[in-house]
């Protein structure tokens, strides 16, 4: 397949036109690496390589754009790319490429998520839910939660702001339910309420 034209469309972006009038969007890096120029003939293997490398380069550029806005897990990035129409295989390849270079760090990202929600006063259950929602594998959850410092002041502050009468069973029940929704276990809730001389009915 003959390359008939190469046109720059924006900084670092090019369009390569083939003799069958197909136009392939690509990057300057791909054109340079594959030594493409008008008049060059590509065999079937060369054309497939060009198309593959172009897709991957464009996917990688979009991934870096997303990562420049905020940190993401590997799965989260893959999903965002495929949701935007990028090929699933290219998205997985790109995420792996970025992870190998330390630009995606699931362990570090998971630890940051855990610290963030712990600091906001959420319990382990809510943190697990957030880790799952962000594509962090279950195999990391316990390690991340074990590393997060336990801070009883958060749950105590929540109780002190809501519980005005430890003897009021209805109030204790509502506070307990709210803490459970925030991700605390019944064991943690019971222990915290004991510090306020309140108990949960079995």
Each predicted region: which residue ranges?
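An alpha-helical, amphipathic repeat domain used for nucleic-acid recognition
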Residues: 1-202
